Amino acid sequence: MIQMQTNLDVADNSGAKRVQCIKVLGGSKRRFATVGDVIVVSIKEAAPRGKVKKGDVHRAVIVRTAKDIHRPDGSTIRFDGNAAVLINKNSGEPIGTRIFGPVVRELRAKNHMKIISLAPEVL
């Protein structure tokens, strides 16, 4: 569960290393976001020659959360930390060309197919 002020790792090669959630998209009363949701983030830490720089505001898709993800078959999955992938505001395509670490298959239901195809492992 991601809310405003949550810090997340970046799981792509866009140049950002750490981001902070500044808004959860999807209605004025929406407080939390989970895997597959789109949030607005501010870049807090970035690589020197990346595509993005510190202070930029971008949209991101959450790909891993430390909070359990419950599946219809009764299984749950959780990760050690929270991670997101930066996306283009207009097209919804990832800014980076590679994705690091596993992502969950719930992204398929939310139509983030490009992220799934770039990921090394889908859990």
From Swiss-Prot:
A biological process term (GO) from this entry: translation
One Gene Ontology CC term in the entry: cytosolic large ribosomal subunit
HAMAP family per the UniProt record, alphabetical: Ribosomal_uL14
Keyword set includes Ribosomal protein: yes
Record-linked Pfam families: Ribosomal_L14 (PF00238)
Gene name of the encoded protein: rplN
Family matches, as InterPro entries: Ribosomal_uL14, Ribosomal_uL14_bac-type, Ribosomal_uL14_CS, Ribosomal_uL14_sf
Protein name: Large ribosomal subunit protein uL14
Family recorded in the similarity comment: Belongs to the universal ribosomal protein uL14 family.
GO molecular function per UniProt: large ribosomal subunit rRNA binding; structural constituent of ribosome
Keywords: Ribonucleoprotein, Ribosomal protein, RNA-binding, rRNA-binding
Oligomer status and interactors: Part of the 50S ribosomal subunit. Forms a cluster with proteins L3 and L19. In the 70S ribosome, L14 and L19 interact and together make contacts with the 16S rRNA in bridges B5 and B8.
Summary of the function given for this chain in its UniProt record: Binds to 23S rRNA. Forms part of two intersubunit bridges in the 70S ribosome.
Alphabetized PROSITE patterns for the sequence: RIBOSOMAL_L14
Source species: Rhizorhabdus wittichii (strain DSM 6014 / CCUG 31198 / JCM 15750 / NBRC 105917 / EY 4224 / RW1) (Sphingomonas wittichii)
